[in-house]
């Protein structure tokens, strides 16, 4: 029996010498929330990240996910397995922010990723599908998007400073190894092989 897929709290914490502050690095399928003055870092290919914060308190967080490959006919079906996983990935982050003291009416988002990086996916480009999902989700949930850098053909390194809302994005036009591609392909295979964990609460 397949194990359910769950979003994981990132545990890779380190001191970033460039920004002279604590940092949390998140990988595919992970998220991180904080009320501290730290930077959250990730590298995106076809995956997307939502950087969401309470603009008043500075409580914020980031996730890193992609939609499982599903039936192309289900692309806009909100209860398809693919959309259910995306909804789950977003709600895990938002619910954790609310638990930490963020107020829903103060939430704002910046969204990144969805590059045309992974090959071998059918129908719509997986990066475009991920980008379209996160835009629609935030629109449906009335969370204002105040910045975005989506699609294109390049991976991105994203630095998010929740306390201030600042985001720095570096497009990686030259890759020195295939670590990013390997991570995303492995994540995509896990998603395809496993069911989504838990029930999704739509609110």
Curated annotation (Swiss-Prot):
Its EC number is 3.5.1.44. NCBIfam families: PRK13487.1, PRK13489.1. This is Probable chemoreceptor glutamine deamidase CheD. Belongs to the CheD family. It comes from Methylobacillus flagellatus (strain ATCC 51484 / DSM 6875 / VKM B-1610 / KT). It catalyses: L-glutaminyl-[protein] + H2O = L-glutamyl-[protein] + NH4(+). It holds the Pfam family CheD. Keywords: Chemotaxis, Hydrolase. Probably deamidates glutamine residues to glutamate on methyl-accepting chemotaxis receptors (MCPs), playing an important role in chemotaxis. HAMAP family: CheD. PANTHER family: CHEMORECEPTOR GLUTAMINE DEAMIDASE CHED-RELATED. One of its GO terms (molecular function) is protein-glutamine glutaminase activity. One of its GO terms (biological process) is chemotaxis. The keyword Metal-binding does not apply. It comes from the Bacteria.
